[in-house]
């Protein structure tokens, strides 16, 4: 019985027709769901390997959250019976806010090296999930390791900047906020630095998939990523918000219930599936964006990988008669790595 089950798993059911090109997904959503179903176990394995890189950062964040909760809890007043009073000691509250601000400052400073070390590993995971998202083969360990070796320099640069951005934004936000108390003009640079931080967060969506897909120097990767982040602003914002859904959901449940098991569930989700699933969503999105705005403008680059395509000789003739198009900023003669 076990042999029959395994044969059915690897070779399919008897009497069922062979898989043909007509059976390929017709759109991106079908491709995403089919590849997610097929690669579910592989994503879990990749997540366990990738989680190690984020463990120092998660420990730093967890310690900061616990410290903030304990600090703010000290401002709550109770009576002799242990009942919570509605009044709050304003002096204790101001001291707690100052202490919390210092804790956040120190945590963001610690997170710079913690996030910096994740860059090469993120590049490796981006390569594997990129292939899986477009129905191509990738070995979970071998290709992950090779992609780390091939892209570790650019990955390290991106992650180092990513680690510094929250720290710099927080410092500038506090500085310009204090200045704005006496002069409202300082609100303008305060908002500008916040917008720059948000824009970097949107551009990072494209940086890792781009560095493992195209032969570009670091400056070109940064420029193209910002162009795509602004040009595809609704999609870029949507992907970033989608990544935040699990964390926000578990946080809201925790605040409503104050049950520690909620945070344990969030940790378990991140440990088993969360990081790889987030990268898989990003890969599916960036594959579509790259096909539309980059691959379609590179001679010989294949587009719509993993999707059903109708081969028509007339289309080839029409392509030969097309007028040469002007190169866009991201083309620059670069070709697909793989």
Please place each PLM-identified region on the residue numbering:
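Helix-coil boundary and N-terminal low-complexity module in membrane systems
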Residues: 1-174, 186, 203-205, 210-220, ...
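Membrane-interface helix termini and inter-helical loops of multi-pass transporters
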Residues: 175-182
